A protein has these predicted regions:
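C-terminal catalytic histidine-bearing segment of alpha/beta-hydrolase fold enzymes
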Residues: 188-286
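N-terminal cap/lid segment of alpha/beta-hydrolase-fold proteins
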Residues: 1-23
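Short beta-strand element of the alpha/beta-hydrolase
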Residues: 14, 24-33
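Catalytic His-Asp charge-relay segment
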Residues: 156-167, 179, 190-192
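Short alpha-helix in the alpha/beta-hydrolase fold that links the catalytic acid
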Residues: 171-181, 206
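Primarily recognizes the serine-hydrolase "nucleophile elbow" in alpha/beta-hydrolase
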Residues: 37-39, 78-156, 166-169, 173
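Cap/lid segment of the alpha/beta-hydrolase catalytic domain
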Residues: 34-43, 47-51, 58-81, 119-127, ...
Length: 286
């Protein structure tokens, strides 16, 4: 983060929902995936959290940028922009009188799960919002772990990674490797894999289908070093060579098109319960 994003601010949108009653509520920022905001996020996640006394803010990073989806080209909205949006949502919630600024967590799906994962890194926190604020809990649903920090510097906040056994878009194996490095760096982090679940198990898509247009980096191991450069461990390709050259190199080396997507009712039910338990214990417990 070099601060250049401050020179061209973008207005983004969010959907705020508060529990019944008054007082300073804990809250969770919800970051959508590559398909952008969808109503099931309010109906499925936000409502469940509101019921246990936790406010929610679903972030829409796409509409303000004139984008509807990023599944076919993730560079349409750079991941760094979505991470900054996540921190901006934290700041916006912290300023509201109804919210307890010390008890704001974050969750997200796929691309949004990456935001939930990356916002746990102390270097990004300090560079973006300073040393006096951070998310209090992180819960990424099936995040993309092809690109991770080589030497993580986690905050003190707890994290829970939720992954699907049969996910061939953002496979659990990549995230388990990163979870191990996070633990070695001192993070309070755990993980859970749901049997039989493909990518998108919590969505409102009822049937698992093969989606040929998805960009998949399931065989990549891309590491962000302490200077912020990304390097492919296998090929040696680096963003030091220029972003365009790097993307072309890793696509040729480890990229492919097509993966499965769709809901799994058993995993959906179980993971919603796990989400409520996690945020209930980390944010709502008196």
């Amino acid at each position: 983060m070099n601060g250049k994003y401050l020179q061209a601010p973008v207005d983004i949108f969010g959907y705020l929902a508060l529990p019944k009653g008054q007082g300073k509520f804990p809250a969770v920022v919800i970051i959508p995936g590559s398909g952008g905001y969808q109503q099931w996020m309010q109906d499925t996640l936000a409502n469940r959290l509101n019921e246990i006394g936790i406010g929610t803010l679903i972030v829409d990073s796409f509409t303000g940028r004139g984008v509807s989806e990023t599944a076919t080209n993730q560079a349409t909205v750079p991941m760094a922009a979505s991470v900054i949006d996540g921190f901006a949502a934290l700041q916006a919630l912290a300023e509201r009188p109804e919210i307890d600024a010390s008890k704001i967590g974050v969750t997200g799906f796929s691309r949004g799960g990456v935001v939930s994962m990356f916002t746990q890194d102390r270097r990004l926190v300090d560079a973006t919002i300073g040393k006096n604020m951070q998310f209090a809990a992180h819960l990424p649903f099936y995040p993309g772990c092809a690109t991770t920090f080589d030497k993580p510097a986690p905050t003190s906040a707890p994290a829970l990674f939720l992954m699907g056994e049969k996910d061939d878009y953002t496979p659990a194996s990549q995230c388990l490797s990163y979870v191990a490095r996070l633990k070695s760096a001192g993070a309070q982090v755990s993980s859970k894999i749901y049997s039989g679940a493909y990518h998108g198990w919590i969505s409102d898509v009822k049937q698992v289908t093969y989606v040929p247009r998805l960009q998949v980096y399931s065989q990549c191991d891309l590491r962000i070093n302490d200077s912020g450069l990304i390097r492919d461990i296998n090929s040696g390709a680096s963003t030091a060579d220029g972003w365009g050259s790097f993307v072309a190199a890793i696509w040729k080396k480890c990229g492919k098109s097509g993966a499965h997507y769709g809901a799994n009712e058993s995993a959906k039910k179980e993971s919603l319960t796990d989400m409520v338990t996690f945020f209930g214990e980390t944010l709502a417990k008196k």
